[in-house]
Amino acid sequence: FIETGWFITDLGSTNGTYVSGHPVDRAPLRDGDLVKVGATIFKFLSTENIEAAFHEEIYRLAIIDGLTQVYNRRYLEEFLDREMSRCRRHGRPMCLIIFDIDNFKQINDQFGHLSGDYVLRSIADKLNRRIRREELLARYGGDEFVVILPETDLDDAIKFGEIIREGIEILPLSFDGWKIPVTVSLGVGRYNHKMTQSSELIASADSALYRAKANGRNQVSN
């Protein structure tokens, strides 16, 4: 019969050839097999596997913010449109929190732009661990972040906003030996059935964020 696929053949080598830990004279190769030749180990990947991994990485780069490694604005808008459609169909609640770092420009000016990047990454990393599977954390731009909370009413969203605010306020941040005190202001917006565009919900939360800043910063407003 005709053999198909990929095979490896040992041509009488001194040290032998091993596939996934087993010595072989001739053996078929399966995707992910580890091939040991002498002191060198190779991982066999099929062309289809490499191509799929390539496309997955390209897609990941398109939806993930490079600095903070959370979702970017593009994916945020796609996700929010889907969730608003679901809320309209099923009459479910949803809230959105938008927040930014208080006096972020002063952090950059006093400690340098690298410290600002460090602060953004640290905050994103801390919050990403608190986000549930059905929720979303995204960098909206600059030092602004958005949290989308499906199946969440206003009271619970405000409580979660307070958890974010308190957690960041006590976050021990230091860069190049300098301690960096950081607080955030947060605005909470609630979806209602009259909203037809995702920009309306974002604008509602953004107005609340403006009030939080106008009232002294380091607080949650709605």
Predicted regions and their residues:
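Short beta-strand->loop micro-motif that forms the acidic, two-metal-ion catalytic signature
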Residues: 105, 120, 126-128, 138, ...
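Conserved metal-coordinating catalytic motifs of nucleotidyl cyclase and c-di-GMP turnover enzymes
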Residues: 68, 97-100, 142, 205
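Active-site-proximal structural segments of metal-dependent nucleotidyl cyclase/transferase enzymes
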Residues: 79-111, 127, 138
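Signal-transducing coiled-coil linker helices
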Residues: 10-17, 22-67, 74-86, 135-136, ...
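Conserved nucleotide-binding and Mg2+-coordinating catalytic segments in signaling enzymes
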Residues: 58-78, 99-112, 121
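A short pre-motif secondary-structure segment
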Residues: 136-139, 180
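Catalytic-core segments of nucleotide cyclases and related cyclic-nucleotide turnover enzymes
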Residues: 154-158, 191-221
